[in-house]
Amino acid sequence: MIKEEIWRVPLQRAVAFFRGQEDVMEETTRVFRFRSCRIDLSELKPASMGIWAAKRVKVRMEGDEVDVEELHHRFLLQFLSM
């Protein structure tokens, strides 16, 4: 399964999220592994929203559907519960 999303968080926060997961391994500062899942992070230009410029990162998760969905669920719990 491949899941690509644009997260409205700075690259540093996305990296901190993956580094904070005990069972996620860091290959490079923008590539992580979780079981069968490979995670690639790409920094995007900020989205212009009037006077605000929201920082964004493209997150691409590829691997077994169960692993991709579990990691995505963790992200939702972390960032949507704030």
Model-inferred region functions:
Residues E27-R33:
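Short Gly/Thr-rich strand-loop-strand
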Residues I6-V24:
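Amphipathic alpha-helical segments
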Residues R33-W52:
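A short, structured beta-strand/loop element
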Residues A54-S81:
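C-terminal structural segments of small proteins and small subunits
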Residues R13-V15, C37-L41, G63-H72:
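Short, surface-exposed beta-strand/loop "edge" segments at domain boundaries and coil↔beta transitions
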